[in-house]
């Protein structure tokens, strides 16, 4: 008897044709089926295309000559030179416009030299005033035959997909003594205080950095909230655009930055919440106040005079991209429908002496900067209304009061964007 056991041949499985890469950074998932067999699946990891495209090459980051040149600039100011060099090279720019506020013009020639040396481009420093992100002047840059513009110290208020040429926004964030900010807030507010904290884009990193530190401090914890009105960054405020806050949810507002212009936007929008300012330059912490009663009185008087007006001068601001053609058209249609005569005017800057020459016009409505009317309206010989105030005049928006005056000009549906905000009574 033959006890030899016949060897069973394993079942042959057809080889799967290999397509693509063998190496993967994905995640392996093993599933056990009811019959006891295991099914192994390899999931693909997410590829962050944007992050890959925006990665600055090592040859730029590690360029010794470039890094030495950057050291000539203030070390606590982040001009993002590496990023700028990379973007200029990537887009193959030949002539680059540099636009910055007056306070930074002192560094413009040094930045110009660096970019010309390491990008092999010609640079043009734009010397006209730049009050904010709304003043980005891609039109003038294009007229100067530039194919790229770097706009400094303001956020991306004007989308880069609608500009005439390639745009790079450099926030110029500024490093400050965060420990002093934290200790100052803890010294001035009781434990557990709820603070709406915000600032200009330069100090946005600090606004976010101190939040976690104060929240996790068991000895003197403070609740820090960084409000956001889209499309602005969280914790960012503009002189014409700020978030409307619930007065029952906050004990105070804290602004980190110098000057009052941007802070006043939040004070006007939220008059019932106490406001404070931390100035990172002189390291002073102050209680700030705004005369909302006077604001309502002055702007109310302007509306009363405007009610009698028959000829309206509709001004399109031409300083950068301050003006919005859609808002002008919308206001023109409403005014004509209300029986008013409309005269359209284009001005880069609006002065009382200039408007005084239009002696046949009864009322002006400016589509440029709402703060021009709010801060300086009393100095003009005729009423100078904002788009919001003009809509109030025509019974298309809610009347302001000592408790509420909207400061949402550049929010997603704001008048500054040619749209109609939520508080409007008529949605067209």
Swiss-Prot record:
Cofactor(s) listed: [4Fe-4S] cluster
GO cellular component: 2-(3-amino-3-carboxypropyl)histidine synthase complex; cytoplasm
Chief localization: cytoplasm
Pathway(s) annotated for this protein in UniProt: Protein modification; peptidyl-diphthamide biosynthesis
Enzyme category, top tier: transferase
Positions contributing to [4Fe-4S] cluster binding: 134, 240, 369
Pfam family, one: Diphthamide_syn
Highest taxon, organism lineage: Eukaryota
UniProt KW keywords: Cytoplasm, Iron, Iron-sulfur, Metal-binding, S-adenosyl-L-methionine, Transferase
Annotated GO biological process: protein histidyl modification to diphthamide
UniProt keyword Transcription regulation, yes or no: no
Subcellular compartments: Cytoplasm
Family to which this protein belongs: Belongs to the DPH1/DPH2 family. DPH1 subfamily.
NCBIfam families registered for this protein in UniProt: diphth2_R
Function: Catalyzes the first step of diphthamide biosynthesis, a post-translational modification of histidine which occurs in elongation factor 2. DPH1 and DPH2 transfer a 3-amino-3-carboxypropyl (ACP) group from S-adenosyl-L-methionine (SAM) to a histidine residue, the reaction is assisted by a reduction system comprising DPH3 and a NADH-dependent reductase, predominantly CBR1.
Self-association and partners: Component of the 2-(3-amino-3-carboxypropyl)histidine synthase complex composed of DPH1, DPH2, DPH3 and a NADH-dependent reductase, predominantly CBR1.
Alphabetized PANTHER family for the sequence: 2-(3-AMINO-3-CARBOXYPROPYL)HISTIDINE SYNTHASE SUBUNIT 1, DIPHTHAMIDE BIOSYNTHESIS PROTEIN
Name the UniProt record assigns to this protein: 2-(3-amino-3-carboxypropyl)histidine synthase subunit 1
Source species of the chain: Candida glabrata (strain ATCC 2001 / BCRC 20586 / JCM 3761 / NBRC 0622 / NRRL Y-65 / CBS 138) (Yeast)
Gene: DPH1
């Amino acid at each position: 008897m033959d006890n030899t056991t016949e060897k069973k041949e394993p079942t042959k499985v057809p080889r799967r044709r290999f397509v693509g890469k063998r190496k993967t950074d994905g995640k392996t998932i093993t599933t056990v089926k009811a019959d006891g067999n295991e099914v192994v699946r390899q999931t693909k990891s997410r590829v962050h295309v944007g992050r890959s495209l925006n990665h600055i090459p090592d040859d730029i980051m590690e360029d010794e000559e470039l890094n030495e040149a950057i050291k000539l600039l203030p070390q606590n100011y982040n001009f993002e030179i590496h990023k700028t060099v990379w973007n200029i090279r990537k887009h193959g720019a030949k002539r680059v416009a540099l636009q910055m506020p007056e306070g930074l013009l002192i560094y413009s020639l040094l930045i110009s030299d660096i970019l010309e040396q390491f990008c092999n481009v010609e640079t043009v420093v734009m010397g006209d005033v730049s009050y904010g992100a709304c003043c980005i002047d891609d039109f003038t840059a294009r007229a100067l035959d530039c194919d790229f513009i770097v706009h400094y110290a303001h956020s991306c208020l004007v989308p880069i997909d609608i500009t005439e040429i390639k745009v790079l926004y450099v926030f110029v964030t500024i490093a400050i003594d965060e420990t002093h900010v934290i200790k100052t807030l803890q010294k001035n507010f009781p434990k557990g205080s709820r603070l709406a904290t915000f600032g200009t884009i330069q100090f946005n990193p600090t606004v976010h950095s101190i939040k976690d530190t104060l929240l996790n401090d068991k000895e003197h914890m403070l609740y820090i909230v960084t409000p956001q009105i889209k499309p602005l960054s969280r914790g960012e405020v503009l002189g014409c655009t700020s978030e409307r806050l619930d007065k029952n949810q906050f004990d105070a507002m804290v602004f980190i930055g110098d000057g009052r212009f941007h802070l006043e936007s939040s004070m006007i929008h939220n008059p019932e919440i106490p406001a404070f300012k931390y100035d990172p330059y002189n390291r002073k912490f102050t209680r700030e106040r705004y005369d909302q009663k006077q604001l309502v009185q002055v702007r109310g008087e302007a509306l009363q005079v405007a009610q009698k007006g028959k000829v309206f001068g509709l001004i399109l601001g031409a300083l950068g991209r301050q003006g919005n053609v859609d808002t002008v058209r919308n206001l023109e249609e409403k005014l004509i429908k209300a029986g008013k005569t409309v005269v359209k005017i284009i001005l880069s800057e609006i002065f009382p002496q200039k408007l005084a020459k239009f002696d046949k016009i009864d009322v002006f409505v400016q589509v440029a900067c709402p703060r021009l009317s709010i801060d300086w309206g009393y100095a003009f010989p005729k009423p100078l209304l904002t788009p919001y105030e003009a809509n109030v005049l025509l019974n298309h928006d809610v009347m302001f009061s000592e408790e509420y005056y909207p400061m949402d000009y550049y929010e997603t549906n704001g008048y500054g964007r040619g749209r109609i905000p939520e508080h409007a009574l008529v949605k067209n």
